[in-house]
Amino acid sequence: MDNLTQKRLNGLRDRLTYIRDIFLGKHADSVKLLQEKLDEFTDKANRGLLQNPYAEESSLEDLFKYVEDRLTKTLTPMEKVRIVRHPQRICLKDILENVYDNFTEVGGQDEHSLDPSMLIARAVIIRRRGKKRYTQSVMVIGQEKGHGAEFRNGGSVKPWGNAKARQFMRVAETEGIPVHTYIFTPGSYPIEDYPGAAQQIARNIYCMAGLRVPVVTVISEGGSGGALAIGLADKRLMLSVGY
């Protein structure tokens, strides 16, 4: 089995695990079918019995996509919550790497740099219109879950992280560039140390209410005050499965 086939098989195994995690025993027949087809393909690949590897692999991919599309149409509210909170869910770094043409992560000063749950980056969007090339710098601010990384606290930001977000909103206003915020949080981190979680969220809201640059927010998981801290925007968007 070549490395490319092995990589794709690992991806299919991850997708099957994801389906099991989301539906928790429901749709057992569909899950069993996917498992059987995946095991059959793996066995043939290991024994070198694939007559047309590309065609058979594409057929297996199509089967996975068909089952996933069918299951997605019957999602319950709790299943949507599991999707939003799953470690394989897209995170802010994935967006930075795949949506923006270039980005540089920046940190705060002193205690404002202590919270890895809040990610700030200067990013660039490049678009072509006819023969002209347009470059737009933006300030990207959002909670980072890191696909379940424990040190990210599940996207629950402490007051220092929200203070860092507020600081760079002001920087964006000074430079006259738009602010893009991404909300991936179940809520603010429950802590009452100075400057206080609720007090810092209030400062952020006050700051955003007066910003003189456009603010666009994209919501995946918008829980409680953690979402409010960076969610006051001129335009709000939500992912197809989000709340």
Question: Where are each of the predicted segments found?
Answer:
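Terminal-region recognition feature
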Residues: 1-217, 221-228, 232-237, 241-243
